[in-house]
Amino acid sequence: MKKIYQYILLVVAMVATASCSNELDDTLQPVENGTLQFVVGDFPAFGEDPQTRASSLGTPDEGKTAWENGDQIIVTLTSQKYGEQAAALTYDGSSWSTEASLSYLENETPSVSVFYAPCYEVTEEGTMQLRSGMQLGMTEYLSGNYEIENGIMTITFEGAIRTYSRLRIAGVANQTLTVTTTDFTPAGATSVATEPYTLTADDKGNAYLYGIFAEGATVTVKKGDVTLKDYTFTAEKNPNGTEHNKSYALDARPVIDGTLGGKTEATEEELAAMVELLKNYIENGLTTIIVTGNNQAKLLKDGYLTPVVSLAFEQLTYAYQDEKIDSYWGTVDLIYQDVKEIVEYEFYCCDVLKSITLPNVTTVGDRGFWACYYLETLTFGSVVTTINDNSGEVFYDLGYKIDGCNLVLNSEQTNAAADYQPSGNTWWNTEWKSITLK
């Protein structure tokens, strides 16, 4: 009678990088009564060099660095007698286990593959299939090594090499994106992807693709009907395409150049175009908008020289009022990334704004924030040192329709000149819904 091996899988997951690997501190335990202890080391991460331009886009993320509760390693085995079989080892936060068993004959050498690929699952019937809603390229596909001896399989990722790259798409947290590619071969695939991807950015605003972009390959990122990024992996920037085991970053955040390409003055036509751009963004769910540039292009309107983007938010409010549309009030989270000064009447009746974040502003003009009725939060990232409040209405009626506006100040604001220090929920003769120091 032929002897059949049914065995439990022993996993030793080692760091796999191009340059080094970490040694395990633990040692394997003796086999007793057919059971084995599973030993797990650090997970091999991609990593992003903090000195590279890519790491400055959005929130850098070196990727997965350790095994987590629920992680799985999949083993497939093909026996001449028992055919194709698959088993999933599951990590519970401290050890690995599987309820499955794999069988082969004593006198045969089975065909075995082991890999970490979260896009796959093992069914109750012992077959491997893509998880619902998953496509190759949406997760890693890292192959491991194995040895079979005396009916025991030992798996290790030591020395494993990624034959693919990672593309980190920097977007807005929890936002769903449509990503289309050309000449992109997903990790774990042997041919290029033909279907678009639907990716949801994580809490850091990042979404990922794993695979190889050939020289000349393209990637397009859209939110609804709005194209956020079109990129080509040109021969100049990426000769021979993306490199194995390397992470790349693509900026697909909804960013507006407040300088309109380096201008200091804007036209009525450019204002109209900006209003339509903002309208398109908002109506396609792009409600976190980043504006770059310190010296923004301005337009003389009603006797005031106002940055064209701020003016466009005012004009958009009037447009929605004329159309009797109020569903977009208080929907936009606006970030003025580089601006250092808010001019007179800059944010005037901007009812579409939910929050305004100003990392670098230190100077505020008279009536700089006036009657933004749905503004929930105003954030100053730097210490405000100058407020030109000739009218006494610099923060007039902010959050009037929603029972007040929250204020966030730099923690060092308490060390500013006396008039610029907050007291309780009062700052600059204005009662705020709350004041938070960060």
What are these language model-derived features?
Residues W370, S391-G399, Y420-P422:
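A structural signal for leucine-rich repeat
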Residues Y420-K438:
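C-terminal capping region of solenoid repeat domains
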Residues I256-F313:
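N-terminal segments that cap or nucleate solenoid repeat domains
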Residues T287-Y304, D322, D326-E341, D351-T363, ...:
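Structural signature of tandem-repeat unit edges
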Residues Q6-V12:
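Sec-dependent N-terminal signal peptides
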Residues K2-Q6, C20-G261, E269-K279:
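Sec-type signal peptide cleavage vicinity
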